[in-house]
Every structure is written in structure tokens, then in C-alpha cells.
């Protein structure tokens, strides 16, 4: 109950407005440290999205030049898939923000509550790597969230910060 009162505005934004206020954020230290273990020079980050994994809690999907990484915050683990094993990707506006699905040869990774702009950046990065990707360019259902959500860093700021932090030793 107390968490509902503390995070009430965020829950309203997510459930009613269809916008996840935590979706466009810079990577936290724990996530950056976990992803860094799987990214080695000359590989580099192309894009990432933050959101909620289906039945698994919060997470991050990251795309590098060589692989797709899924960071699972609940278990603090990273799943890796070679980029040539990705069959297709989708980013569609769902009930709680954008839903990103990455279909690989062995399974489908799904995340909801992703930021539209970060999902768009991932879509562009996948297309540039020759992977079939679709992107639904629709905004959240409501627009009231922008009045009380506060400012968010730009997509370019998020990606630049993540690239610098993932290269740090």
C-alpha cells in the first residue's frame, strides 16, 4: 500500500496514460556493469530499451554490432544471442508503452513499457544490420503524463552515456 502512495503518479502514468515514466533513462550502474562483461572491443553499443520483461520484472534489451543482450534485473543475469540468430523484431505501441519483441532462432524475448524513441532507435539499428524489423510510430494514449512526469534525457544523451559507461573499465 505504501509503495502505491509513493509511486502513485508513476502507476497512474503507466496504467492510465500508457506511458512508462522509467522507460527513457540512462543505464544504472548495476546494469552497465552487467552488460559491460559481455561487450568487448571492437564491439560497441548500437541501441537499448528499458522496460518490463513479460513475467520477469524490469530489464534492459541492448543491441551491439555483434550480439543482442537481455539484462534481467530480477536475477541480475544477462542472456546473449549472436546478432545473426535474430530472425525479426517488432516494436508496437501496447497498453503500457511500446512493446519490443526480438524473435531469435530459439525463443522470443519480449519487453513492454519501453520508450517509443528508444524503441525507434533500436528498430533503426536492427534495420541497419540487415534484420527485418517493424516499428509502430504511435504515441501513448494520453498526453497528461507530460505535465507531471518531468523531463527525460534525450535518446542521444542516453545512448552517449551508455556507450561511455560500457567502455569504461
Model-assigned labels for residue ranges:
Residues 48-105:
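Phosphoinositide-binding peripheral membrane targeting modules
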Residues 103-125:
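Canonical phosphoinositide-binding patch of PH/PH-like domains
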Residues 2-7, 118-169:
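Terminal and domain-flanking low-complexity segments
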Residues 1-61, 103:
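Anionic N-terminal interaction surfaces
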Amino acid at each position: 500500500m505504501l509503495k502505491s502512495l509513493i509511486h502513485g503518479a508513476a502507476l497512474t502514468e503507466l496504467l492510465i496514460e500508457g506511458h512508462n515514466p522509467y522507460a527513457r533513462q540512462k543505464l544504472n550502474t548495476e546494469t552497465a556493469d552487467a552488460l559491460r562483461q559481455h561487450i568487448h572491443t571492437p564491439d560497441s553499443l548500437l541501441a537499448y530499451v528499458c522496460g518490463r520483461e513479460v513475467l520477469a520484472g524490469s530489464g534492459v534489451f541492448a543491441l551491439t554490432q555483434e550480439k543482442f543482450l537481455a539484462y534481467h534485473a530480477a536475477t541480475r543475469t544477462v542472456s546473449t544471442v549472436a546478432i545473426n540468430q535474430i530472425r525479426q523484431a517488432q516494436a508496437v505501441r501496447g497498453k503500457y508503452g511500446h512493446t519490443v519483441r526480438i524473435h531469435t532462432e530459439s525463443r522470443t524475448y519480449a519487453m513492454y513499457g519501453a520508450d517509443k524513441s528508444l524503441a525507434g532507435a533500436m528498430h533503426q539499428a536492427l534495420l541497419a544490420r540487415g534484420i527485418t524489423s517493424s516499428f509502430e510510430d504511435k504515441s501513448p494514449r494520453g498526453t497528461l503524463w507530460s505535465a507531471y512526469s518531468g523531463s527525460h534525457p534525450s535518446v542521444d544523451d542516453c545512448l552517449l552515456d551508455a556507450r561511455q559507461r560500457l567502455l569504461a573499465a
